[in-house]
UniProtKB/Swiss-Prot annotation:
Misc note: The thioredoxin reductase active site is a redox-active disulfide bond. The selenocysteine residue is also essential for catalytic activity.
An example molecular function term from Gene Ontology annotations: flavin adenine dinucleotide binding
Record's GO cellular component terms: cytosol; mitochondrion
Residues spanning the signal sequence: none
Post-translational modification: The N-terminus is blocked.
Name of the molecule in the record: Thioredoxin reductase SEP1
A GO biological process held by the record: cellular response to oxidative stress
Species, as recorded: Emiliania huxleyi
Length: 495
């Protein structure tokens, strides 16, 4: 049977946050737009609807499960505030059912949005036939040949499995954990990325024994002092860590558990049995199986797409989101994989293509948060990178430990939460990095990101009167510098 054919002004390959934003914005400018999106099942068979990683297996479910863990912590604290609380019991199935129900409502909403914006949606896997044409195949095998004047590739990425026996047969990834129909039980999380630590945090937080196996450092690419604080807090709250280790095999046991063998840096070996083995060792971009060579688009050695203002080496083909090679940007950036970045880049690209606008995506000074049990919010440079770029003599770091008021009655730890500003001395102590570990770190960081984006200096922070008692006010009170050697520990709540 001959393939159906269709012609569009813009074809978007990938229905994640960036692709959807770009397609709807282009349609609002009167263009004929189509989106192709198709989810190949994970090795355990998990699949999902329209919306990409963030909605289905990323930001949304992980934040909801992080909240589940925080609620459990809050119930423990409640007695200190006078509440008589029976021993709380968590129901994994209820949580997963409600989370998946919410995700499905979002999937439906995205499909409705495309329809109401006049965007044609193909639930089909697209591969290039030539620079202007793709072949889209749906789950029933129906083939549609689609041509477009411009094409945007935003196919995202998928979790990587280690190349060891039993990994794909017996392990899961973040593609699967949010839809697990039964509790994870004793869980081994392999990796120390933000995905690894976030998953380990909420699994432990809702009541399951959790171990993290890490090869080297936690939260690579983030400020390492802050990463250490996140890790220490997790250890103090019951998450075990196997450090300097790499898994070598996963085997099924007669009891139904998974036996994981590993090798340590000193050459010694070890093993343990777990009910769930979750791999979070990184992600691979989805560019290898879309016929991108037939489009003439060049790839970096890591499979990502080098771009200039989202444009590839083929003038009418663009890329946004995870697949952009952030290291090839000028300056390099690690923010290309963030959902809000993809959304912003997609909208701005559509405006440049079809509305005569000129605004470009700025990948610098983008705020982010790691939803570990002790949340970590950041905007700007890690301390190590600031020193590397500008020299230690040109950097001033203001810092302080603090204890949220809410932690006082339950007698939570002192000098656990921490805030620091990284300032560039030759530019009037312009703030080039802000980092905080503490409750609601994301909510706090978002507001400060606006100020830092606008060029705020340490003097601006000092001149701002804080809201008392809040966690955020710590940034208006910072006085001790690392250079001075003065103590950053706090003994009271009034500066």
């Amino acid at each position: 049977m001959a393939a159906a054919e269709a012609q569009y002004d813009l074809l978007v390959i990938g229905g994640g946050s960036g692709g959807l934003a770009c397609s709807k914005r282009a349609a609002s400018h009167g263009k004929k737009v189509a989106v192709c999106d198709f989810v190949k099942p994970s090795p355990p068979g998990t699949t999902w609807g329209l919306g990409g990683t963030c909605v289905n297996v990323g930001c949304i479910p992980k934040k909801l499960m992080h909240q589940a863990a925080l609620l459990g912590e809050g119930m423990t604290d409640a007695e200190s505030f006078g509440w008589e609380v029976a021993a709380p019991k968590h129901n994994w199935e209820t949580m997963v059912g409600n989370v998946q129900g919410h995700i499905k409502s979002l999937n439906f909403g995205y499909r409705s949005d495309l329809m109401s914006n006049g965007v044609k949606y193909y639930n089909a896997y697209a591969t290039f036939l030539d620079p202007h044409t793709v072949e889209a195949v749906d789950k029933k095998g129906k083939v549609t040949k689609i041509t477009a004047s411009e094409i945007v590739i935003c196919t995202g990425g998928r979790p990587r499995y280690p190349d060891i026996p039993g990994a794909k047969e017996l392990g899961i990834t973040s593609d699967d954990v949010f839809a697990l129909k039964s509790p994870p039980g004793r869980t081994l999380v392999v990796g120390a990325s933000y995905v690894a630590l976030e998953c380990a945090g909420f699994i432990k937080g809702v009541g399951y024994d959790t171990t993290v196996m890490m090869r080297s450092i936690p939260l690579r690419g983030f400020d390492q002092q802050m990463a250490g604080l996140c890790k220490t807090y997790m250890q103090e709250h019951g998450v075990a860590f196997i450090e300097g280790a790499v898994p070598t095999a996963v085997e099924a046991t007669p009891s139904g558990a998974k036996k994981v063998s590993w090798k340590l840096a000193d050459g010694s070996v070890g093993s343990g049995e777990y009910d769930t083995v979750l791999f979070a060792i990184g992600r691979d971009v989805c560019t290898s199986a879309i016929g991108i060579d037939k489009a003439g688009v060049k790839l970096s050695s890591n499979g990502k797409v080098p771009t200039v203002n989202e444009q590839t080496n083929v003038p009418h083909i663009y890329a946004i989101g995870d697949i952009i090679d952030g290291e090839a940007l000028n300056p390099p950036s690690a923010t290309t994989e963030l959902t809000p970045v993809a959304i912003q880049a997609g909208k701005l690209l559509a405006d440049r293509l079809y509305a005569g606008k000129s605004a470009l995506m700025d990948y610098s000074m983008v705020a982010t948060t790691v939803y570990t049990p002790l949340e970590y919010g950041a905007v700007g440079l890690p301390e190590e990178e600031a020193i590397k770029l500008h020299g230690e003599d040109n950097i001033e770091v203001y810092h302080s430990y603090f204890k949220p008021l809410e932690w006082t009655l339950p007698h939570r730890g002192d000098n656990v939460c921490y805030a620091k500003l990284i300032c560039l001395k030759p530019e009037g102590e312009r703030v080039i990095g802000l980092h905080v570990c503490g409750p609601n770190a994301g909510e706090m960081t978002q507001g400060f990101a606006v100020a830092i984006k606008a060029g705020a200096t340490k003097a601006h922070f000092d001149d701002t009167v804080g809201i008392h008692p809040t966690v955020a006010e710590e940034f208006t009170l910072l006085a001790a510098t690392k250079r001075s050697g003065d103590s950053a520990e706090k003994s009271g709540c009034u500066g």
